[in-house]
Amino acid sequence: MVKLALSAVISLMFAAAGLTTASLAHAETAAPKKAQVKKAKARHTVRLASPRVEGRVVKRISRVNGRHKVSYQRMVTAAPAFATMGDLAGLSATRDPLDLKSNVALVLDQDNSEVLFEKNSNIALPIASITKMMTGLVVVEANQDMDEMLTVTDDDVDRAKFSSSRLRVGAQLTRANMLHIALMSSENRAASALGRNYPGGKPAFVEAMNAKARELGMTDTHYVDSSGLSKMNVASARDLAKLAMAAYQQPMLRQFSTDVNAIVEANGRPMQFGTTNRLVASPDWSIGLQKTGFINEAGRCLLMQAVIEGRSVIMVFLDSKGTQSRVADAGRIRKWIEALKPAALNIGSGSAPAYSTGM
């Protein structure tokens, strides 16, 4: 009995062993297949982060050397629109029939100062780099040596608004070239160097700017620097029209402000600069003087003398919205003037302007 029982146990053990061996053999053959399936699945599976993780979103998925590569794009929240001084004064509520994007506009006949169009033209606002036109007027009337070499120093670096400049500290240019790129390209360091190299330095130069403004009857105008970077440089459109007519009498200011581009030498090395006003390069326009300007507080600004239908006019646009809006407003004014009959402008009659609105 014992032998029979022992034989039965041994038989069961071998049977179990055979089952285990078979199971192991099956497992060994099955494992590679499962691994292959998993590997195959892995090849077709792209692990992505959350659609938006820490300000990133999936930009594209590409295949590189048989592997998927995920490229992400950083999300940048748009900055809220900056309220200009004109907006804060409520000027954006002023409407006009031409739907100008500028909060302030003035157009007058250059020959007799007849106002053809005005919109908030007596409100003093920041004028940004239009300031440089007064800088130019003071420089040319001071009769300083225009061939004198001026050096850009650390004092000319903008540490308030951190505006860019192609002129490095140590760059040397003639006074004429400094004035040229200040008017044509609105080069801030050049404008600063011009003021700093005036007899008495920057304080005396700013005082000369304000003295000239008083001489021209610019009662709403005040300057604090030669570049226009400060929001404290303010003027009304009516005052700027007076400045334009005075500056127009200076051939150097007319030429430098309306050149499309120019090559100037800095430390003996040629540098090419271009205009900030694309209209001067247009064959459809005849422009004799111009200056653009922009800082956040001022919006887009434009001062310009042009001939339209044989008539010389002064245009001033302040606090315009959009990078091209000031030149677009100039185009709207031009079409409006071209569409008017000469009699409708009351040229020389001393009557009310063709259009007037605002404060």
Sequence positions of predicted segments:
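N-terminal secretory targeting signals
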Residues: 1-101, 339-359
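Short, hinge-like loop/turn segments at secondary-structure boundaries
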Residues: 25-27, 168-169, 274, 333
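Alpha-helix boundary/interfacial micro-motifs
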Residues: 16, 20-21, 126-131, 137, ...
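Domain-terminus/edge residues, biased toward the C-terminal soluble/receptor-binding domains
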Residues: 218, 222, 228-359
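Active-site-adjacent loops and short helices of periplasmic peptidoglycan-processing enzymes
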Residues: 48, 52, 61-238, 242-251, ...
